[in-house]
Amino acid sequence: MFKGSIVALITPFKDGAIDRKSLKRLIDFHVEKGTDGIVIAGTTGESATLTFSEHEDLIKMAVEFADKRIPIIAGTGANATHEAIALTKSAEKAGADGSLQIVPYYNKPTQEGIYQHFKAIAEETSIPLILYNIPSRTGVDMLPETFARLYSDFPNVIGIKEATGNVARVSEMISLTNPDVVILSGDDALTLPMMAVGAKGVISVANNLVPEDIATMCRLALEGRFEEARQIHDRYWKLFKTLFIETNPIPVKTAAYLMGLIDDIEMRLPLYYMKPENEEKLKSVLKDYGLIR
């Protein structure tokens, strides 16, 4: 269930609220285009600016709109363990298929603190947990040994979204666990290199815009057809880089609006609209790929 091309879905807003109509359209779009799973309320979904009740409602909406046609992985991590447990229990009750759990951010726990945080969540819930290691945002790196300990101790800890930018981490974590461990790239530009050494797929930003091709690339890689997969990787390299010319999800949400995938470009402060010169660069790249006119 948790392999291949999984989209880190944007959250559409309109008039200060979650835009149900656009959200349903996005989920239908990904079902139609062959996306393997949806992460809802993750970093790309602006989870940090959702209220607790909005967070719960967004997950419930996604489960409802997916209607068991595509797995829903709910972003329910937090830097307060009790909050992460509450959100995860709520997602489990709503019918989510899995949970994405970010390493606690800002408070910079030790490796033992990270272990105890995820231990508490794993013991209080039964939903499959995918841990999320992104030190550039959290300020702390969950080491492979800490992940391996959690993976060994708790059967509902099934994998990790790895976003350190270090491809060698894949081999290291497999050596500490087993080849079946679910390792997912957290960086579109590193998806293919990571899958070449054993990762199972990606939680992708670019998938918001080109889901069919990202899904095909991942399927080819899982089948060992790396030369064919590399052709897709090379084709979209420029898009992968352009989607990070400003803080994610600002460029991808702007692109989705320009492509007509959502009805409003609205973002929540402190995220703000793109600089005009960067938006022009984004438009140029989207035109090059035939995504807008």
Swiss-Prot record:
Keywords: Amino-acid biosynthesis, Cytoplasm, Diaminopimelate biosynthesis, Lyase, Lysine biosynthesis, Schiff base. Pfam families: DHDPS. It is an enzyme of class 4 (lyase). Pathway: Amino-acid biosynthesis; L-lysine biosynthesis via DAP pathway; (S)-tetrahydrodipicolinate from L-aspartate: step 3/4. One of its GO terms (biological process) is diaminopimelate biosynthetic process. The record marks 43, 106 as: Part of a proton relay during catalysis. It comes from the Bacteria. The keyword Lyase applies. Signal peptide: none annotated. One of its GO terms (cellular component) is cytosol. CDD domains: DHDPS. Its main location: cytoplasm. The active site is at 132 (proton donor/acceptor), 161 (schiff-base intermediate with substrate). Gene3D superfamilies: Aldolase class I. It catalyses: L-aspartate 4-semialdehyde + pyruvate = (2S,4S)-4-hydroxy-2,3,4,5-tetrahydrodipicolinate + H2O + H(+). Its EC number is 4.3.3.7. One of its GO terms (molecular function) is 4-hydroxy-tetrahydrodipicolinate synthase activity. It is found in: Cytoplasm. SUPFAM superfamilies: Aldolase. Homotetramer; dimer of dimers. NCBIfam families: dapA. Belongs to the DapA family. Catalyzes the condensation of (S)-aspartate-beta-semialdehyde [(S)-ASA] and pyruvate to 4-hydroxy-tetrahydrodipicolinate (HTPA). This is 4-hydroxy-tetrahydrodipicolinate synthase.
